[in-house]
Amino acid sequence: MKPMYKKYLNLFVTVVLSLVSFYQQAHAEEIDYAADGQRRAQSAGELLVGKPAPDMKITTIDGSTIDLSEVYGKKPVYVKFWATWCIPCREQMPGFEAIYKQYHDQIEVISVNTGINDNLQSVKPFLKKMGLTMPTVIDDGTLARALKLRVTPQHVLIDKQGRFSYFGHVDDENFHNQLERVIHQPTVDKVTIVNSSAPDAHTYQVGDTLKNLAFTTINDNSIELKFGEDNSANIGLVFFGPWCEWYLEETAPDSSKACTQVRELLEDKSKSNNIKWVSISTNVWSSVAELHEYKKSYGTSLPIVFDGDGKLFEVFGVNQIPTIILMDKSGRIESKVSVQDSEFENVLTSL
């Protein structure tokens, strides 16, 4: 073999091997991403499996009501959380519709849009595009808290006895085995309905006055905010997700842009003493470790609180990212605005 040909052959082999290595690495990362979602979903539900599920009444987007207490004992329930901007959700939708068509007489299938950066205007066209025909709900956070939403998509299976049976993220053989198991479980004559839903928490509204607030940051620092005192400050709460800017860049660019805009603006505004800002992160696709990485990557100096149990999002009635809540020195909530509100840009400009 001539030296020149040998040289080109070696170069070709090197390039091919590099491409194979790159593909394998990318494929491994994709598998790890799915495995991470599966781990999060199972971890969130592990303490609930075997326990009674909530006897909730769910209203679909067409106005129908599904009373779970009337379903338990007769059929199992399959709840699937999803979002229009979620890439693996989109990938799983054909299979989701196939499950509904095949098993809808045997299992109560409920499609639950998380409501996070979604509304009726985004959900309806998505359902049509994906060809989804099962009952669909747009959550206000109630189902997410009751069923421990941590990832999108997330599967929740409830057996015929009305007990949590399975939590998952991936559409794999194990999930389908679990689905078949609850479907073919013997029907029970009697189910003890346990109201496992917590009483409705008070949700703060614009105009309400708070006496004080206390947080613990991801650095384990305590923040105590007392209102109505001489040294009280105006307070700004920013509800966000560490993935909002990069993950939504292509699938929900307006939301991604809003998250960047809010972060950059408040980073600048925090240098003044007019408002004391606190960032509060969602627990969906988030953890303390990821928030530390977010803080490092974006160089933000604002204190960050991880809402691990979702209670802060609940009591302030937040389900959109980003959402800004402003309180005066007396603790009165002066305004609450999210990316989906028409006055969002005006509020940002006025800060």
Predicted regions and their residues:
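Boundary at the C-terminal end of the N-terminal hydrophobic targeting segment
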Residues: 26-28
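Short, internal strand/loop/helix patches
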Residues: 124-160, 278, 289-327
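Thiol-/selenol-based redox modules, centered on thioredoxin-like
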Residues: 31-39, 159-209, 320, 326-351
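Hydrophobic beta-strand anchors of alpha/beta hydrolase catalytic cores
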Residues: 78-79, 109, 155, 236-237, ...
